[in-house]
Amino acid sequence: FDSLDIIDEWDFINNDGNTANETVDEDNYGQHNHGTMVFSTLAGYDPGNLIGPAFDSEFLLAKTEDVPNESQVEEDNYVAALEWGEQNGADVASSSLGYLDWYSYCDMDGNTGVTTIAVDIATYLGVLCITSAGNWGTSEPPPDPCDTLYYYISAPADADSVISVGAVNSEGDIAYFSSHGPTYDGRIKPEVCARGVSTWCVNANSDSYRTASGTSLSAPLVSGAAAVILSAHPDWTPMQVREAMMMTSDRVDTPDNDYGYGVIDVMAAIDYETSAIDENSIPDEFSILNIYPNPFNPTTTMQFKVGTDGHTSLHVYDITGHLVETIINEKLMAGDHYYKWDASGLSSGIYFIHINLPTGNITQKITYLK
């Protein structure tokens, strides 16, 4: 760790700038153990023993988990840490945690969990969020979907924009403990997998190394890989990195709710050409100038310009691709146009605005927060 570039740190439990153990309880419960193992997997640098994929990055360290207790304030700490990270220029947020004690499977819809919503907002603001899928894979699915949450992924792994990470062994086989998908609304989870069985890491209690297992160890490997991809493509958005990693993983042709899209392939992801819109390819005849505010509650205004007279359609879709509302479906005259959309009566979450003219189309993501 001596060579790592830690530019700032903050303890959101004790509200100070020290992320090491500070209290007797933290010592007794081994507050430092989990974070040390995870951070070493991500960033450790000891040639011949351990080299994490992101060892040459800059780091912000945030302590949000009160290990002796499991309470909802930890979600608030996580949200505060995401906001702090975004304000301080974070490109990737790696977390090895999950919240399930006060949620049911019915809540894993991408729109309910406090941290789930925060991840979608952070992604919109330019922070790629990666989190562990969870270690409840040996449990049985709850008889009633609205019973206590086990077996499935937990918040914030259910977020629409997150990269949730399952665990495989050295042979690429799914770990028996790795939590499963799908989300309650039917999306495949996890997104990808990495090694999380007998993963090499630092021993937090001695000057040595050890192995550890869990999706807590697979998530930082994917986070480090994402940092490498971003170093090759600094202009990519979080969703472009997410797409590249998923579309180049080894099960992309047969994704399922154990492996997701499979084990990542970093070099293939770097070479991947994302399907995101190239601004230079957008026709001159029209453009979306602004959608504001975004995130919004409950109304937002869409401003766009039509270069020539012609038929225009503007639709709103939810995250599953279902049509929510058609706002425009008529001939428009050339010029600037403004439309206010009211989402009252809809659930909080991610929606997509799609505008179409004979000359082309464009899609933009919006976030509705109640």
Give each language-model segment a name.
Residues I282-Y292, F296-K370:
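C-terminal outer-membrane/trafficking sorting elements
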Residues E83-D107, S132-A133:
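Short acidic, glycine-rich surface-loop motifs adjacent to enzyme active sites
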Residues T274-D278:
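Short, compositionally biased serine/threonine- and acidic-rich segments at solvent-exposed termini, linkers
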